[in-house]
UniProtKB/Swiss-Prot annotation:
Belongs to the mannitol dehydrogenase family. GO terms for molecular function: mannitol-1-phosphate 5-dehydrogenase activity. Its EC number is 1.1.1.17. NAD(+) binds at A3, L4, H5, F6, G7, A8, G9, N10, I11, G12, R13, G14. GO terms for biological process: mannitol catabolic process. It catalyses: D-mannitol 1-phosphate + NAD(+) = beta-D-fructose 6-phosphate + NADH + H(+). The keyword Nucleus does not apply. This is Mannitol-1-phosphate 5-dehydrogenase. It comes from Yersinia pseudotuberculosis serotype O:1b (strain IP 31758). Disulfide bonds: none annotated. InterPro entries: 6-PGluconate_DH-like_C_sf, 6PGD_dom2, Mannitol_1_phos_5_DH, Mannitol_DH, Mannitol_DH_C, Mannitol_DH_CS, Mannitol_DH_N, NAD(P)-bd_dom_sf.
Length: 387
């Protein structure tokens, strides 16, 4: 199995790339970080530190790397059996032209073996979005051929992979938690789905996408935002603070009530899933900084993301949402000198005031009860900070 993976960052190396390599794939990473590419090509292997109760070091072998802007990438797509990505939602559109070029070359070479493309991003149906960008760069004839021979498979991914420790001398070593979940839409494959241990097939992907978004992502973000307000440095410190924990757990229970209603999830199993996530946040071996986890507050406060989407579900089913609203107010309070979106958030709040700013960012009506409620909690948070 020939595999090409876009994004040689921590998630690429520590999660998706590792599962592909473990499955015996001939794996090539595509990235723009030249020192990383040089190191991968020189060593052909790297170490993954799996941390948790059963800590272990695993070696990933027989890998190579190419620059994602190079002609080699196009040639690799023309030959590959599977193409995966972990580049971040913003970058997906940027790699689409290269993917399209690879598919055109594949067509010209008469390669009709099935190819499956799987975007492994923190977003809902990311591969379908990538497909739209790719198709925009294809002629009608090419689109027809691609539709026949190439599967665009949506997925849900979950593994906490913090950035490398400062002062780490090995550019390739990566630290990951023990838990990992990669769920793919089994209905979207062309040909037989590849056998990859750790990749699960489902015919009800949206249930898993929303379960992860509404629980792990919602909880992680609110832990970061409340943690920063309370002066904590890491996610572990924040979630061990009883006041933070109470709101985070409350928010996950509120979003969970939406999932139970929407997808008929078993309430007891979902409660166990929430507890499992809380214990993952407590992992003493993961030094996950609240400022890093809180980054890009404008994206995280947008209509389809981890804070507003579950809130909209509570409104749809007339369910409680006080903790989610507190989380939204905390997100509005996020500050970071390093993050352009945090700076933009401050500007919007100053120019428009909290009510109009939240309405603009989230798409919620400015005169709605939930916006009033979020603004009132936000104002109380700001007053507390001022004292």
């Amino acid at each position: 199995m020939k595999a090409l993976h876009f994004g040689a960052g921590n998630i690429g190396r520590g999660f998706i790339g590792k599962l592909l390599a473990d499955a015996g794939a001939q794996l090539t990473f595509a990235d723009v970080n030249q020192p990383l590419l040089d190191a991968l090509n020189k060593r052909k292997s790297y170490q993954v530190n799996v941390v948790g109760e059963q800590a272990r070091v695993e070696e990933v072998k027989n890998v190579s790397a190419v620059n994602s802007g190079s002609p080699e990438v196009v040639a690799l797509i023309a030959e590959a059996d599977i193409v995966t990505t972990a580049v971040g939602p913003q970058i997906l559109a940027r790699i689409a032209a290269t993917v399209a070029q690879g598919l055109i070359t594949r067509h010209q070479q008469g390669n009709t073996r099935p190819l499956n493309i799987i975007a492994c991003e923190n977003m809902v149906r990311g591969t379908s979005q990538l497909k739209q960008h790719v198709f925009a760069a294809l002629s009608e004839d090419e689109q027809i051929w691609v539709e026949q021979h190439v599967g665009f498979v949506d997925s849900a991914v979950d593994r906490i992979v913090p950035p490398s420790e400062a002062g780490s001398t090995d550019i390739l070593a990566v630290t990951v938690e023990t838990f990992s979940e990669w769920i793919v839409d089994g209905t979207q494959f062309k040909g037989q789905p590849p056998e990859i241990v750790g990749m699960e097939l489902t015919d009800n992907l949206m249930a898993f996408v929303e379960r992860k978004l509404f629980t792990l992502n919602t909880g992680h973000a609110i832990t970061a935002y409340l943690g920063q307000l309370a002066g904590h440095q890491t996610i572990r410190d924040a979630i061990l603070d009883p006041a933070v924990r109470q709101t985070v757990k409350g928010a996950m229970e509120e979003s969970g009530a939406v999932l139970i209603k929407r997808y008929a999830f078993d309430p007891q199993k979902h409660a166990a899933y929430i507890n499992k996530i809380l214990s993952r946040f407590e992992n003493p071996y993961l030094h996950d900084d609240v400022e890093r986890v809180g980054r890009q507050p404008l994206r995280k406060l947008s209509a389809g993301d981890r804070l507003i989407k579950p809130l909209l579900g509570t409104l749809e089913y007339q369910l409680p949402h006080d903790s989610l609203v507190t989380g939204i107010a905390a997100a509005m309070s996020y500050r970071s000198e390093q993050d352009p979106q945090a700076q933009e958030l401050v500007t919007l709040l100053a120019q428009l005031g909290p009510k109009a700013a939240l309405a603009q960012i989230s798409g919620l009506p400015a005169d709605s009860e939930v916006v009033e409620q979020a603004v009132s909690v936000y104002n109380a948070m700001q007053q507390k900070l001022a004292h």
